[in-house]
């Protein structure tokens, strides 16, 4: 059997009950985006998007009268966070008791001294910053000195920006690996991220060369699938999020269009197991930059691709569409928002049904394990029987 998961990165479905504790009460990525920049999403509507509680419907965006052919629900995140690693780890059965470490004042000297020793250079910035602003403000000094630009955010990340004409990509990746070695124990951030950029001021981020260097997660459903002899194909930043653990094939992508194209290729190639894709543009290009129009266009791009993805499904295949957190482009600041995750599913012959409000993202992993015949006794309640 072939099961394909596509994560629409940051497409939140409304504030979680505890959102106020994260400063996000009232956030709603989907509703606010579509209100400011309406685009038609007819195919997502047919999967049940408009049936979800708190999703606003309208003839111009998500029509209320769409003939629903999929299964639909929304998911609570029980782990205390609103970042990529927390959400994706929980999808595959890892529920965190404590949030990943964050550094709102930058990284301490004992970290940065070791990092400087590893690179043989100094560093710039070392404080929370927007990715677009940090290269605008420090890019010229970086080109003069060759020092890497180190910055963080409200997420648990150590980000290293460098101009591609100043620092070769492989050198940047080596610096990230060195930082990953340093950032353990009390300094263990979830991800070290390579952020190359190019061009002239105000500079352009080279998103296709971004790489994430994650902490290694505990055992996940991905490991269970691999142990069961199944194909486990990670597309986009998915393999990086799990430190490459549990995959039989890893495929990097340039953008959402490339991610969709490579997902279709693997679906048509007869993968026996899981195809797991992250489409990051909504988050990286438009959510953090607070660009509702760009965000809406990315949603519409995916909606237009849905018929091709459905057509590529094998007769017994299943397509699941998820989101890992919110990133409301109309919200204050530039960081993620604590929201419900989307849950939409389609299979040939599957009738429309309400999967309700799932108590944890881990229900996804439990469902994947049961559907593909892998042994999993970790967190999560499978909804596989509700789909058959």
UniProtKB/Swiss-Prot annotation:
Mn(2+) 2 binds at residues 283, 288, 336. Belongs to the phosphopentomutase family. InterPro entries: Alkaline_phosphatase_core_sf, DeoB, Metalloenzyme, Phosphopentomutase_DeoB_cap_sf. GO terms for biological process: 2-deoxyribose 1-phosphate catabolic process; 5-phosphoribose 1-diphosphate biosynthetic process; metabolic compound salvage; nucleotide metabolic process. This is Phosphopentomutase. HAMAP family: Phosphopentomut (MF_00740). Its EC number is 5.4.2.7. Mn(2+) 1 binds at residues 9, 324-325. Pfam families: Metalloenzyme. Pathway: Carbohydrate degradation; 2-deoxy-D-ribose 1-phosphate degradation; D-glyceraldehyde 3-phosphate and acetaldehyde from 2-deoxy-alpha-D-ribose 1-phosphate: step 1/2. Isomerase that catalyzes the conversion of deoxy-ribose 1-phosphate (dRib-1-P) and ribose 1-phosphate (Rib-1-P) to deoxy-ribose 5-phosphate (dRib-5-P) and ribose 5-phosphate (Rib-5-P), respectively. GO terms for molecular function: magnesium ion binding; manganese ion binding; phosphopentomutase activity. Disulfide bonds: none annotated.
């Amino acid at each position: 059997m072939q099961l394909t998961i596509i994560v629409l990165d940051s497409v939140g479905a409304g504030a979680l009950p505890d959102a106020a504790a994260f400063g996000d009460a009232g956030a709603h990525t989907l509703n606010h985006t579509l209100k400011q920049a309406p685009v038609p999403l007819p195919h997502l509507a047919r999967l049940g998007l408009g049936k979800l509680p708190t999703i606003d419907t309208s003839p111009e965006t998500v029509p209320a009268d769409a003939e629903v052919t999929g299964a639909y629900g929304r998911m609570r995140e029980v782990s205390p966070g609103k970042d990529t690693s927390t959400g994706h780890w929980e999808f595959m059965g890892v529920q965190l008791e404590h949030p990943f470490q964050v550094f709102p004042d930058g990284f301490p000297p004992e970290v940065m001294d070791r990092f400087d020793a590893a690179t043989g250079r100094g560093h710039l910035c070392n404080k929370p910053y927007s990715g677009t602003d940090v290269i605008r403000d420090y890019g010229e000094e970086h080109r003069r000195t060759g020092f890497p630009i180190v910055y963080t955010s409200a997420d648990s990340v150590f980000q290293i920006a460098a101009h591609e004409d100043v620092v070769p990509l492989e050198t940047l990746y080596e610096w990230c690996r060195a930082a990953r070695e340093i950032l353990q124990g009390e300094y263990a951030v979830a991800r070290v991220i390579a952020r190359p950029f190019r061009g002239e001021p105000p500079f352009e981020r080279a998103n296709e060369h971004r790489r994430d260097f994650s902490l290694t997660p505990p055992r996940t459903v991905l490991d269970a699938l691999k142990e069961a002899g199944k194909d486990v194909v990670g597309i986009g930043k998915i393999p990086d999020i799990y430190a490459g653990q549990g995959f039989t094939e890893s495929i990097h992508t340039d953008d959402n269009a490339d991610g969709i194209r490579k997902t279709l290729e693997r679906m048509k190639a007869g993968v026996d197991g899981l195809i797991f894709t992250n489409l990051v543009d909504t988050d990286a290009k438009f959510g953090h930059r607070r660009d509702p129009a760009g965000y809406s266009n990315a949603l519409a791009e995916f909606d237009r691709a849905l018929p091709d993805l459905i057509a590529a499904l094998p007769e017994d295949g299943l397509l699941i569409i998820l989101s890992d957190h919110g990133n409301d482009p109309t919200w204050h600041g530039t960081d993620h928002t604590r929201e419900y995750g989307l849950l939409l599913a389609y299979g040939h012959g599957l009738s429309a049904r309400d999967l309700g409000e799932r108590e944890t993202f881990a229900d996804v992993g439990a469902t994947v394990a049961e559907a593909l015949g892998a042994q999993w006794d970790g967190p999560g309640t499978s909804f596989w029987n509700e789909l058959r």
